[in-house]
């Protein structure tokens, strides 16, 4: 099982998931540090999730459904501190709008970035996500 999962894009933004030191058990509960590097602004949040496998499923479904998918595929953390919305065009480009939100005592912070991915990279991204989140694909 991998300790980090990184998506790098040719055009800029980088999204990184890392296991937090108090990570419990993959598949049941997980604490992660999620970092969005979108120069010149970078930000990180601690994300706790009861069902971390759902993030791997999001990337796996994206790798299967990019062609012909209508509309936007969306996933959101329980507390809304991480939101990802994926859409595709007819040329095989997948745009994943990513939002990191932190609310510290009423001081709301938001960092956004759009990762533009090539369809050919999606299977590799899905495999990396499966390894990080401990998800066993049915494929």
Language model segments and positions:
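Intrinsically disordered, low-complexity regulatory segments enriched in Ser/Thr/Pro
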Residues: 38, 45-47, 94-116
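Intrinsic, low-complexity N-terminal interaction/targeting segments
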Residues: 25-33, 74, 82-107
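Short, well-structured hydrophobic secondary-structure segments
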Residues: 29, 33-69
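Short, highly charged low-complexity linear segments
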Residues: 13-22, 75, 93-97, 115-127
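Surface loops and adjacent helix of pleckstrin homology
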Residues: 20, 48, 60, 87, ...
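Charged, alpha-helix-forming regions
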Residues: 1-41, 48, 121-123, 132-139
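Mixed-charge, glycine-accented linear interaction segment located at domain edges/termini
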Residues: 104-139
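Short, internal acidic amphipathic alpha-helical interface segments
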Residues: 55-90
């Amino acid at each position: 099982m991998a300790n980090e999962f990184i998506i790098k894009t040719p055009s800029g933004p980088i999204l990184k998931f890392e296991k937090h030191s108090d990570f419990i058990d993959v598949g049941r509960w997980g604490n992660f540090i999620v970092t969005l590097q979108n120069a010149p602004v970078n930000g990180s949040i601690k994300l706790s999730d009861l069902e971390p496998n759902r993030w791997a499923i999001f990337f796996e479904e994206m790798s299967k459904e990019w062609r012909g998918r209508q509309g936007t595929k969306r996933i959101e953390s329980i507390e809304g501190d991480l939101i990802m919305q994926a859409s595709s065009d007819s040329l095989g480009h997948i745009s994943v709008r990513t939002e990191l939100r932190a609310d510290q005592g009423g001081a709301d912070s938001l960092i956004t970035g759009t990762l533009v991915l090539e369809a050919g990279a999606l299977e590799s991204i899905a495999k990396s996500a499966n390894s990080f989140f401990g998800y066993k694909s049915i494929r």
